Amino acid sequence: MAIREIKDVERGEIVNKVEDLGKPFLTHEDDEKESENNESYLMVLFSTFVAVCGSFEFGSCVGYSAPTQSSIRQDLNLSLAEFSMFGSILTIGAMLGAVMSGKISDFSGRKGAMRTSACFCITGWLAVFFTKGALLLDVGRFFTGYGIGVFSYVVPVYIAEISPKNLRGGLTTLNQLMIVIGSSVSFLIGSLISWKTLALTGLAPCIVLLFGLCFIPESPRWLAKAGHEKEFRVALQKLRGKDADITNEADGIQVSIQALEILPKARIQDLVSKKYGRSVIIGVSLMVFQQFVGINGIGFYASETFVKAGFTSGKLGTIAIACVQVPITVLGTILIDKSGRRPLIMISAGGIFLGCILTGTSFLLKGQSLLLEWVPSLAVGGVLIYVAAFSIGMGPVPWVIMSEIFPINVKGIAGSLVVLVNWSGAWAVSYTFNFLMSWSSPGTFYLYSAFAAATIIFVAKMVPETKGKTLEEIQACIRRET
């Protein structure tokens, strides 16, 4: 039996086309009031807090190697190649986790996927803590990478699926913010404690997450899709408050899921067709540029970079990075829906270009024994400008654009491709960074600056402005320019 009417889950309205499901799932319309004055969002807020413990864990894993490089290499007598493998194998695990995350969360639920992630991360941190050589160290790092690869998918999906319309936009931004906070905390406390103790602190968000999962509901949308009718309504009622009328929303979710099931399933070869080719080029290219401006190399090895620039210790620099990242990320969250995507990412790339030039010049001056008193200041200033610029645009905006340029029927497979490209680039950059620095420290940062300049040109020529447009309008714009 064909579905002729589809209820808008967020507004309780009826629409007449399956195509209306193509509208962006995450919106920022705040002008409508809730119909139920006694509606409670305490469980939504608590559930979000539990979920973003996974985001915090993500940041902790990414930020671990920067303040610990010197001490790990010294204590375990690791070569440059061995530590480079330790730093980069995180992304190999994350690639595998990201590719499998969709199937895991569809099979075991969003909560089940988060449990799986937490268990992998706990196992990984314990392996790092008990290691006495490179092998167990790499195994532990791989396990934490797999865990955060799954987290990178399931946390924002879970938050989006449990949140009411008027809170969804704000709550979903907490994912990126908590990643930054997690990495910043690793930078800060990693400068004060041993690398083994820092590994143990990585257990804390996982333990909080596992404990919290016992008290929060499963995603109502997943329960409905899995056919758990009774559990679906219980979970939705728990999220909306015991006195809230969930009839319209529950019916809308069920009808919406039925409508989605009649859409054609996407195939990998569809992504190279003319219909989707431009969107794929935009999504993949932005992820390539995001990684090849060098963020994971600079982030993973910040401490060692400052030492090479002339500091007796890299701790001051990593602390400064931590202090810059959080407020700038908050600012970027505020600006993204006001300034637009294109201006923000181009300004960000311009700042990255400047930061790379300053940092590269500091190493050039040091190598030529010129203006040595200026070298540390130039290095710190350049890296801080780089980090601030990346945090405000190049970090979050490519993910936002990726979520907007693909229609719903190919979003899953296209998103998997884009995530795989992102983690592949992260691995390549983190693995080659130390080798590039050994080859030429100035050349490394000048190379990254070239990618930043190329980003500006690419965005100006290829990327449409998506602010304030529906998904259909964005796709129409892309087709007109094809």
From Swiss-Prot:
The keyword Transport applies. It is a multi-pass membrane protein. GO terms for cellular component: membrane. Sugar transporter. The keyword NADP does not apply. This is Sugar transporter ERD6-like 16. Pfam families: Sugar_tr. It comes from the Eukaryota. GO terms for molecular function: sugar transmembrane transporter activity. Its main location: membrane. It is found in: Membrane. Keywords: Membrane, Sugar transport, Transmembrane, Transmembrane helix, Transport. CDD domains: MFS_GLUT6_8_Class3_like. The chain crosses the membrane at residues 42-62, 80-100, 117-137, 142-162, 173-193, 197-217, 280-300, 316-336, 344-364, 382-402, 413-433, 443-463. Belongs to the major facilitator superfamily. Sugar transporter (TC 2.A.1.1) family. The lineage of its organism: Eukaryota, Viridiplantae, Streptophyta, Embryophyta, Tracheophyta.
